[in-house]
Amino acid sequence: MLPPFLKEVLGNCISEDDRDMMLMGTLTCISATLQNVVGEYNHDDWHPMLYFFVMADAGMGKDSLKYCREIVAPIHNELREASEQLMKQYKESKRESKPGEKDTSYVNEAPHRRTLFIPTNSSAASVIQQLDNNGGVGLIFDTECDTLSAILKSEYGDYSTIIRKSYHHEPIDLSRRKDDEYRVIERPMLAICLSGTPGQLYTLTPQAEDGTFSRITCYHIPFKAEFRDVLVESINHNYDNYTLRGRFFQLGKLYKQRRESFFRGGSYRIVIPQEYCKEFNEHFRQMNQEVVDDISHDMQSVVRRLAFTVFRIMMVLTSIRFMDEISNPSAMTPKDGSRIVIRCSRDDFDIAMAIGDVLIYHTVYCYAHLPQSKVTTNGQGEIITKKSKMEQLLAALPNKFDRETYRAVSMKHGYPVSTTAKWINDYVRQGRLEHSSQNCYRKL
């Protein structure tokens, strides 16, 4: 079902956790390079940039995410080398000009330095400047989130507002007194791919209600008491192609070639067929209700933004499959210069929806362990849902009981009495309790 390119990527993974993490990491990195792709969602056009965070304890393998970087590294390297060449030409031209002579061989301003990657230790001003240099495009990638967490705490480095605004392509601007500088990025297109420990995630998004958290889809790698095979015989291998870094770098060169052909075709619009739209809406409407009922009403923003993320994943999958299948997209470019329309396939729709179903569980888990989260967990760190609390209460009640009895049981378990009263009424409506007489109940 996966596009062939992604099958090749996942063929280099060594565990199920690796496969899930590498799939989302690859989709996120590639999303940062698809600024010529849009799709309509909630009556507006959006680009497919994703935000992704891998949470795991130290030594649990989250560092494998670094190989996803290699898939877009050739694009970054080309941008950087081209910028360095322009800067070299600028400096040489400026040096060769004669004093007092009006020189037209070079521009008065130095060329902008363009890159794909934006360092996590950048100041807020530097992030805006680099996005501006890149035409609004950028990828924040780091396998050690503490670098970003530390810079966000500093007065000059807090660009959390930039992260939140860029998610919805909201304009961001910068004004500095020096040189009377003013920069505005009307439509930032930022992707973020990070990994870190639970403590690093909590530093990045210290509160459950923080708008940053609901924008980031999380994947949690659980602790496993195991040791992988790490030593293998490698005599006579071509190391450039045999090592994981080498194989992913080769995949990066392949992706760069296909993307260049893709860009020669112009710009693209991803369309979700009408028959899938109703299914999408119903799926997330039900998920929203279940999560709000079982976890917390604070999770509604997470579900809504997860739905948006799943739509963006559909856009990325569709674009990758198009690159796999169409070698000369420029032949499809409309004569009027409008966007090439690509319909999302059933496979890519189903894959994205399945990814969303996995991510909601991981994101809920991460949410439940945030400081000040309203979600209850047991001694093993597992989430205690509203349904399990209700079942626990019902099991603790005798076959026949009155209001005073369930009030006492409620207080013993630490549940608000008003909440327990609602649960009792729910069980009556469901036919699991009979309201036999005033203030008296019987299990059925």
Label the predicted regions.
Residues 1-444:
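Phosphate-handling catalytic cores of nucleic-acid transaction enzymes
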